[in-house]
Amino acid sequence: MAENVTSAKATAKMVRVSSRKVRLVLDTIRNKSVAEAFAILKFTPNGAASDVEKVLKSAVANAENNFDLDQASLVVSEAFANEGPTLKRFRPRAKGSASPINKRTSHITVVVAEK
């Protein structure tokens, strides 16, 4: 009943960045090798790139430690970001009114698999 596991997953929840911004970064690394994905993320001038890099690093560590997979043969097979809960705040405005401010969060998931 021993299955041959060829993929590992990592998730970061409640990350304080909009899922729309994270998806732009994830689209650049999907279906790339892990080494190439790290190189892309290192030079991406987007704030979400550092959060995605942390999740990718965690997924690679999970693959190496839990499933004895080789980092050189890993590919980013899945990468997606879902919406997390929105923190709702209010900014005081003129004449006693207030404007809503939505601080959006996201759940980032990265799955790495062997080629």
UniProtKB/Swiss-Prot annotation:
GO cellular component: a single term: cytosolic large ribosomal subunit
Keywords, in A-Z order: Ribonucleoprotein, Ribosomal protein, RNA-binding, rRNA-binding
SUPFAM superfamilies in alphabetical order: Ribosomal protein L22
Keyword set includes Transferase: no
Domain of life: Bacteria
GO terms under biological process: translation
Description of how the protein assembles with itself and partners: Part of the 50S ribosomal subunit.
Biological function: This protein binds specifically to 23S rRNA; its binding is stimulated by other ribosomal proteins, e.g. L4, L17, and L20. It is important during the early stages of 50S assembly. It makes multiple contacts with different domains of the 23S rRNA in the assembled 50S subunit and ribosome. The globular domain of the protein is located near the polypeptide exit tunnel on the outside of the subunit, while an extended beta-hairpin is found that lines the wall of the exit tunnel in the center of the 70S ribosome.
Protein name (database record): Large ribosomal subunit protein uL22
